[in-house]
């Protein structure tokens, strides 16, 4: 098993399913361990990226939407920018977070 595959399996946590835009079917999605941070003017969006296990199509699960940067703790914001795997795993195992993003598990 490749190191990359082992890391992906490690971060999968709760098995998450979603209709894949690439495959067109309900597929298992895996926590990539990566965050996407987008600043638009004086607002910030933060997503946790999941990938389709079959075709690698991405699905962004929203953590913060159109939030003022000061509302996000500075240490947490730095962890998002650094793609901290422990933080990604915490979110991936948080059922409330998954429910907010309409994930099936």
Predicted segments with their positions:
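Generic short beta-strand segments
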Residues: 26, 30-35, 47
């Amino acid at each position: 098993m490749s190191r990359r595959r082992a890391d992906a399996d490690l971060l999968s946590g709760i098995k998450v399913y979603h209709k894949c835009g690439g495959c067109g079917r309900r597929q298992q999605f895996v926590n990539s361990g990566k965050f996407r941070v987008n600043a638009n003017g004086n607002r910030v969006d933060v997503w946790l990226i999941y990938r389709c296990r079959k075709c690698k199509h991405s699905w962004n699960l929203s953590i913060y939407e159109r939030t003022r940067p000061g509302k996000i703790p500075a240490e947490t914001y730095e962890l998002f920018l650094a793609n901290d795997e422990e933080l990604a795993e915490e979110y991936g195992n948080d059922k409330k977070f998954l429910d907010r993003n309409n994930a099936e598990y």
